[in-house]
Amino acid sequence: MSLDINQIALHQLIKRDEQNLELVLRDSLLEPTDTVSEMVAELHRVYSAKNKAYGLFSEESELAQALRLQRQGEEDFLAFSRAATGRLRDELAKYPFADGGFVLFCHYRYLAVEYLLICVLNNLSSMRVNENLDINPTHYLDINHADIVARIDLTEWETNPESTRYLTFLKGRVGRKVADFFMDFLGASEGLNAKAQNRGLLQAVDDFTAEAQLDKAERQNVRQQVYSYCNEQLQAGEEIELESLSKELAGVSEVSFTEFAAEKGYELEESFPADRSTLRQLTKFAGSGGGLTINFDAMLLGERIFWDPATDTLTIKGTPPNLRDQLQRRTSGN
């Protein structure tokens, strides 16, 4: 992995009681040893694979102002990280769920792009076997489940300050409160809405195939084409490029897909991140609620699966063998 650490700082927030978070600040930067480099590479890999929200700094953002001064050489990275950890403590202290943790600031370069990663990591307890084959307790950083994470694309921020996607963050497993306090700390607001862009793309594809007067099989083939392209981009860590997608759909209509999307006003960006859960709707129907979970291939609608909107009834002809076996055993038992 072509990842080079420029500077990295680590501090700690310790929760002493319900009201107080204690600051433990390092007096020096971490050395980019092999172990540290391996940890940052793992953080980068895990974070890059997750669905993220996009944001941008507000004009009043204290973090952005301090970061700008640091980038201009008016403050060193360690001082910047120490002051930022203090501001994070002040924000966290407002929330009863605050637990503290290790606060990491890492300025690194990956594939010619500079990033600043800010995250709060926690230790987990586990067991290990030592050289004498004894079992001893141990601790490790829970990188895979870190949810207080943000990353600033410094290259994008400095070369294209009007961008709405230079800052990314995770919304967190415990709901909106995590996102709220972290956004307050960052002094940021939500920017590009990747889910909305993907939903707009799906609607544009459906309308595009309808206007081209394609039959059911042809429409599904187009959806599969779109899904294949978008999934390839997702797997490669690349964004959906409307122009490239339009070339994939050449021949579907006399009008190109990009021209169609622009004329109809879908407000799609020239490129935007793929959203896995939204894109699945191109090839599958899925839903759950009231103790019922249903998931089936889109091509089955109208063939083996029929929906009556008047009665909101779904009729399935031919059940999966394992489901049929369970139903037979349950009904025969009664």
From Swiss-Prot:
Pfam families assigned: NA37
InterPro entries according to UniProt: Nucleoid_associated_NdpA
Chain coiled-coil ranges: none
Domain of life of the native organism: Bacteria
Protein's cellular compartments: Cytoplasm, Nucleoid
UniProt entry keywords in alphabetical sequence: Cytoplasm
Main location: cytoplasm
Record GO cellular component, one term: cytoplasm
GO MF: double-stranded DNA binding; single-stranded RNA binding
Disulfide bonds: none
NCBIfam families tied to this protein: PRK00378.1
Family classification: Belongs to the YejK family.
HAMAP family: NdpA
Protein name per Swiss-Prot or TrEMBL: Nucleoid-associated protein YejK
Organism this protein belongs to: Escherichia fergusonii (strain ATCC 35469 / DSM 13698 / CCUG 18766 / IAM 14443 / JCM 21226 / LMG 7866 / NBRC 102419 / NCTC 12128 / CDC 0568-73)
Underlying gene: yejK
